UniProtKB/Swiss-Prot annotation:
Annotated domain remarks: The BC-like-box motif mediates the interaction with elongin BC complex. The HCCH motif (H-x(5)-C-x(18)-C-x(5)-H) mediates the interaction with CUL5.
Post-translational modification, as annotated: Processed in virion by the viral protease. Highly phosphorylated on serine and threonine residues.
This protein's GO CC annotations: host cell cytoplasm; host cell plasma membrane; membrane; virion component
Protein name: Virion infectivity factor
Single Gene Ontology BP annotation: viral life cycle
Region entry Multimerization, spans: 154-166
Further details from the record: Vif-defective viruses show catastrophic failure in reverse transcription due to APOBEC-induced mutations that initiate a DNA base repair pathway and compromise the structural integrity of the ssDNA. In the absence of Vif, the virion is morphologically abnormal. This is probably a macaque isolate.
Source organism per UniProt: Simian immunodeficiency virus (isolate Mm251)
Stretches for region Disordered: 179-204
Pfam families to which the protein is assigned, alphabetical: Vif
Amino acid sequence: MEEEKRWIAVPTWRIPERLERWHSLIKYLKYKTKDLQKVCYVPHFKVGWAWWTCSRVIFPLQEGSHLEVQGYWHLTPERGWLSTYAVRITWYSRNFWTDVTPDYADILLHSTYFPCFTAGEVRRAIRGEQLLSCCKFPRAHRYQVPSLQYLALKVVSDVRSQGENPTWKQWRRDNRRGLRMAKQNSRGDKQRGSKPPTKGADFPGLAKVLGILA
């Protein structure tokens, strides 16, 4: 008797055709700015047997855990939806793994990648001095309860950005630059021969880059 086919259902986030933008941003931050130097990017031709997987991006985290963003294509071929894309976001620890939402994935990433306000900035803000660091992943703080220090530094940075300090005005443009950088690099190899984008762009976050309504 023929064995009945078994299906495994996993939660995925259906996305528009933005995987090339995602791949481009990851490669830029890995090979150009070195912000994601420890990240492992696996393209579709190295995935192996999983023909529906178009890419795997593995982010090593603290205490031996890691976050994996797996992109899927050729979903539901029986209906002809070959252009349908989706991603699965999974967090792995030593003895446990679970699927996570994009907002929580951003929090996990910010615990290891992209600098935030340093402890010395609080003392500089109290003394009225110029702040020397800035949070490069502000979207990761969106869905968590921020500390009083972070809120105070955000207020100080926003107020000073409206004044005469051009540095803070430039930092506020970094998030938009990160998205624009991904769009430019995803146009193809011809764009790679042009002048590279400005370094120091903020990381826009998983949901923003992939177009996920999180």
